[in-house]
Amino acid sequence: MAASTTAPKGSRQTADERRHTIVEAAAAEFSAAGLHGTSTHAIAKRAGISQPYIFQLFGSKQELFLAACSASFQRVRDAFAEAAAANPDNAREAMGTAYVQLLSDRESLLMMLHAFAASSDPVVREATRREFGDIIRLVERLLGSDPEDVRGFIAQGMLLNVSAALDLPGLAGEQAWAARMFEGTGVDCG
């Protein structure tokens, strides 16, 4: 059964805190079943709110999905910016390490993959393009604008996304091909 993300009894959340709680609950549900496989009833139950309240705050299930996706993409941007700021002389390696650490957050990882998968919807596609473009522009700014380097960094990240979603690190001990996917990436396959 899904855990509730409501505030402790006796405390009142601000509107921003309530929105954040609902987005977190939505991310947990959407990351498991995607946009079309998730019910607003399940999200409301997890958040400890009424289902109509979701629509009052977000307007539609799609808007809530986009808010949850945006939060996941923002985690990536924040991790890249923080890593590059902490190690400006070796920003690429620091950002790569930060991304590998993010992969342990399966919820965010799966939210991004569900955003890509739901992009047959024009509204989702446009929002996901915008989020992905923001990541690419940030990587260009942090690493320099060499297109080949940026493409390589993004491609490595996408390979890691798919590999982590398929739990290839857990398979690496049994399958040599899975282990080869992580050579030199810093991913712990042990």
Residue ranges and their predicted role:
Residues P122-G133, R137-G190:
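Hydrophobic/aromatic-rich alpha-helical bundle segments in the mid-to-C-terminal region
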Residues F65-S72:
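Alpha-helical DNA-contacting segments of helix-turn-helix folds
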Residues L103-P122, F132:
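Amphipathic alpha-helical segments used for helix-helix packing
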Residues Y99, M112-F116, F153-G157:
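Short alpha-helical scaffolding segments that buttress acidic/His motifs in well-ordered protein cores
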Residues R18-T21, A25, E29-E63:
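Helix-turn-helix
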Residues A25, E29-A32, D78-A83, M111, ...:
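Solvent-exposed, amphipathic alpha-helical segments
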Residues A67, D78-S108:
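Hydrophobic alpha-helical connector segments
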Residues M1-A7:
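Short, intrinsically disordered or compositionally biased N-terminal tails of bacterial proteins
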